[in-house]
Curated annotation (Swiss-Prot):
Function in brief: Catalyzes the last two steps in the biosynthesis of 5-methylaminomethyl-2-thiouridine (mnm(5)s(2)U) at the wobble position (U34) in tRNA. Catalyzes the FAD-dependent demodification of cmnm(5)s(2)U34 to nm(5)s(2)U34, followed by the transfer of a methyl group from S-adenosyl-L-methionine to nm(5)s(2)U34, to form mnm(5)s(2)U34.
Pfam hit, one: DAO
GO molecular function: flavin adenine dinucleotide binding; oxidoreductase activity, acting on the CH-NH group of donors; tRNA (5-methylaminomethyl-2-thiouridylate)(34)-methyltransferase activity
Catalyzed reaction equations: 5-aminomethyl-2-thiouridine(34) in tRNA + S-adenosyl-L-methionine = 5-methylaminomethyl-2-thiouridine(34) in tRNA + S-adenosyl-L-homocysteine + H(+)
InterPro entries: FAD-dep_OxRdtase, FAD/NAD-bd_sf, MnmC-like_methylTransf, SAM-dependent_MTases_sf, tRNA_MAMT_biosynth_bifunc_MnmC, tRNA_MNMC2, tRNA_S-uridine_synth_MnmC_C
Localization (cell): Cytoplasm
Protein name per UniProt: tRNA 5-methylaminomethyl-2-thiouridine biosynthesis bifunctional protein MnmC
Organism expressing this protein natively: Shigella dysenteriae serotype 1 (strain Sd197)
Region feature (tRNA (mnm(5)s(2)U34)-methyltransferase): 1-245
């Protein structure tokens, strides 16, 4: 069975207050002066102080083999801040740090370890505040308003490097080869790791390590680095430095899921909901020139316009990609929303998913068997549900303590307002009719004879995405739904958490003293007219799931208050994020893919045309990470997702899976 919780570091603090690993019998940093050793070995060994002012790109990427207490990262971050203060006009503006850790520290141990270096406190406190829960995979932390990005990969580095997407190849400017000493932790110091370091290193990229072990030097040379010895720090006689002086050939392991970015930095986004709003922010942070075209007269009039939406992950014991994506998307979303410098109605009150019948009880039992971290999800017995939710249901379930609700409409509006302050241009009542290539750009034809030309285009317009010739064959479908707005009552007012059953019920929003009950589900429909039948069904589903609950019968729908919207969904419940695939070319190029995988060309896509769509009913959870993934891909930066999960988000995935099995593909 797949486990979704990572084992934390097993450590103790010695007489000097230095953390020591019980498993590896080694210190996390020098008892003498760990901070100075980091500056000498890793910053000095990679010549970063001299390289930063002369670096010709806006982003510098550092990768590290063992995060530990984060000393190397914090020291580098401090040095990077000092560089930016001294050279405000330098080309280099942002720092990206990628680190791998098999046994992450608990937050409490991290805080204790950081007390060693009071001079690093301003940076350490920011790291502590965002320290992720022990889930496998990549945790992206956006620090210093996005000027510093930390990708923490939890798991075995030798396993993780083989799971990295090809888009990370030749992206790393400097390697910090750190970790417990080779004699203490031989499983990490392998030729497999050295080869991965070479694959990820940019031509002329560097590396530094505290060890001078001969097998390490020879292994790195065999991988492609030019190595040399340097005087070690303090009492250590020698250390190693290296340079990638060659350009290694890089075969693409899965060309049918290959992702391409763009060298251009000017984009039009078609949308107006949460996906386009968050993508605008992510691209502006990367210095893109962004224009948004919205078909409506105001933002968030589509699927993002609800008063309250629940935030919690979608989990399934039988779907590895779904679990990996949504668990990491959920934790990223919470960190992201907590940092946003905009106001929006929300309450991280928790979400409880209830087993209201035999099928839902079985599903929850399977989820609980996945060894999830307690910070993510915990079992709750029927007699405890009333205590944590405030209402009696006679059902057991699963609770997401960090979940809750937020107002999507307010979030979307205020994020777009923030983006406008950062340079976003918005045009309302621009209904895109079609788009076509013209002189290496995209010509956009809008209703009422309006036209515009842009270098890059992103389609983030929900269920309307399939209205264009380039996207008409995508396997997505519309789902119309009605959310009921009901006034609170003395009993309903006791509800403290979001309840999920065969529907959902939110606690009252203090801003309007109403609850939301959702939502009806009409697959294939785009009808947004109010429905008395849907209103009644929303109420009845609540009563049917909790027949003994008097509070459920108090739900009053007589005001006929509701909101109808249309979602865009996929069969596998995952979003579509990436290049817009060329359907006809895919069928031609991959006609014999099942028999000729070794001859496969890169996935046929439309140049400089991307999509962020099909968020279904979990857009509040998935949109922040999807926006970050797409912005990173478009900007040719490291993507915070492993290759197999990233493939499960690829817009061509449903076609390619069939073609890999030699099956016929139908449009839509």
């Amino acid at each position: 069975m797949k486990h979704y919780s990572i084992q934390p570091a097993n450590l103790e603090f010695n007489a000097e207050g230095t953390p020591v690993s019980r498993d590896f019998d080694d210190v996390y940093f020098s008892n003498d002066n760990g901070l100075e050793e980091t500056r000498y070995v890793f910053l000095g060994g990679n010549q970063l102080e001299a390289r930063f002012p002369e670096y010709p790109h806006p982003l510098f990427v550092v990768a590290e083999s063992g995060f530990g207490t984060g000393l190397n990262f914090l020291t580098l971050w401090q040095a990077f801040d000092q560089f930016r203060e001294a050279h405000p006009q330098a080309q280099l503006q942002r720092l990206h740090f990628i680190s791998f850790e098999k046994f992450p520290l608990t937050r409490s141990d991290l805080v204790l370890a950081h007390q060693h270096w009071p001079e690093l406190a301003p940076w350490a406190e920011q790291l502590q505040a965002q320290w992720p829960m022990p889930l496998p995979g990549c945790h992206r932390l956006l620090l210093d308003e996005g000027r510093v990005t930390l990708d923490l990969w939890f798991g075995d580095i030798n396993e993780l490097t083989s799971q990295l997407d090809d888009s990370l190849n030749q992206k790393v400017d400097a390697w910090f080869l750190d970790g417990f000493a080779p004699a203490k932790n031989p499983d990490m110091w392998t030729q497999n790791l050295f080869n991965a370091m070479a694959r990820l290193a940019r031509p002329s990229g560097t590396l530094a390590t505290f060890t001078s072990a001969g097998f390490v030097r020879r292994g790195l040379q065999d991988a492609g680095f030019t190595m040399q010895k340097r005087k070690g720090f303090g009492r250590k006689r020698e250390m190693l430095c290296g340079v990638m002086e060659q350009t290694l050939p890089l075969p693409c392991s899965t060309p049918w899921f290959n992702r391409t970015g763009s060298s251009k930095r000017e984009v039009a986004i078609i949308g107006g909901g949460i996906a386009s709003a968050l993508l605008s922010l992510a691209l502006l942070r990367r210095s893109w020139q962004v224009t948004l075209y919205c078909a409506d007269e105001a933002p968030a009039l589509g699927a993002s316009g609800n008063r309250q939406g629940a935030l919690y992950p979608l989990l399934s014991k039988h779907d590895e990609a779904l679990n990996r994506f949504f668990s990491n998307a959920f934790t990223f979303a919470r960190r992201f929303y907590d940092q946003l410098p905009v106001k929006f109605d929300h309450d991280w009150c928790g979400v409880t998913q209830l087993g209201w019948d035999e099928k839902s009880q079985h599903k929850i039992a399977q989820m609980l068997s996945m060894d999830l971290p307690e910070e993510l999800a915990v079992a709750v017995e029927a007699n405890a549900v009333e205590q944590i939710t405030g209402v009696a249901t006679n059902c057991s379930g699963i609770t997401y303590p960090q979940g809750g609700w937020l107002c999507p409409a307010e979030l979307t509006r205020n994020v777009l307002e923030l983006a406008q302050q950062q340079g976003l241009q918005i045009y309302y009542q621009y209904q895109l009719q079609d788009l076509s290539r013209k002189d290496d750009c995209w010509l956009l034809n809008f209703a009422e004879d309006q036209q515009a030309t842009h270098s890059v285009v992103v389609l983030a317009n929900g269920h309307q995405i399939s209205r264009f010739s380039q996207t008409s064959s995508l396997p997505v479908y519309s789902v119309a739904g009605q959310v009921s707005h009901i006034p609170t009552t003395p009993e309903l007012a006791k509800l403290k958490q979001v309840l999920c059953y065969d529907g959902y019920l939110t606690p009252q929003n203090p801003a309007n003293q109403h609850h939301c009950i959702g939502a009806s589900y009409h697959r294939g429909s785009e009808d947004t007219a109010y429905s008395d039948e849907d209103q009644q069904q929303n109420r009845q589903r609540l009563i049917d799931c909790f027949p003994q609950a008097q509070w459920a019968k108090e739900v009053d729908i007589s005001e006929k208050e509701a909101r109808c919207g249309v979602r865009c969904a996929t069969r596998d419940h995952l979003p579509m994020v990436g290049n817009v695939p060329d359907y006809e070319a895919t069928l031609v190029e991959y006609a014999s893919l099942a028999e000729q995988k070794d001859k496969a060309v890169s996935a046929p896509v439309y140049d400089d045309l991307f999509m962020l769509d099909a968020l279904g009913s979990r857009g509040l959870c998935s949109a922040p990470l999807c926006a970050e993934i797409l912005a990173a891909q478009m900007s040719e930066e490291p993507i915070p997702m492993d290759a197999s999960t990233l493939a499960a988000l690829n817009p061509n995935r449903l076609w390619v899976r069939k073609l890999l099995k030699g099956k016929a593909v139908k449009a839509g």
